[in-house]
Design a protein with these regions (language model features):
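Core catalytic alpha/beta fold that binds nucleotide/phospho-ligands
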Residues: 1-125
């Protein structure tokens, strides 16, 4: 069985593939941190967000976890935190790994129950 998750942002479409459930998100770093959204992050998260890149690191990590769960942002936003490089759900460690990286002026996050992730290729169309 193969699992996959798609994401897109400003002309980039990206795909994560795995043997188990996987969540994936990407956001172009040319955007600006959205104050209305920033106010919805937890206080612990806000303490880690000092730049647009930090904002999108937290945003993509959260969204990759939501997609891993198969949920919607609206249903689970307030229950999720991304702090210190780890995902928390309802105040407890979520037990999943998030790999964060930036490439091609884009923030990427992959989430799953994996020991490690590997990047195979980035192709801009």
């Amino acid at each position: 069985k193969i699992h996959f998750n798609l994401s897109h942002s400003k002309g980039l479409t990206a795909l994560a593939v795995g043997k188990k459930q996987v969540g994936f998100d990407c956001e172009n770093l040319d955007g600006k941190a959205r104050p209305a959204v920033l106010n919805k992050f937890s206080e612990r998260e806000k303490a880690e967000i000092h730049s647009t890149a930090d904002f999108y690191a937290h945003w993509t990590a959260r969204e990759s976890y939501v997609k891993f769960l198969g949920e919607t942002l609206a249903a689970s936003w307030r229950k999720i935190e991304y702090v210190g490089g780890k995902i928390y759900f309802g105040g407890e460690a979520a037990g999943v790994k998030v790999m964060r990286f930036d490439a091609e002026n884009t923030a990427f996050s992959v989430c799953g129950d994996y020991q490690k992730f590997s990047l195979r290729k980035i192709v801009r169309m």
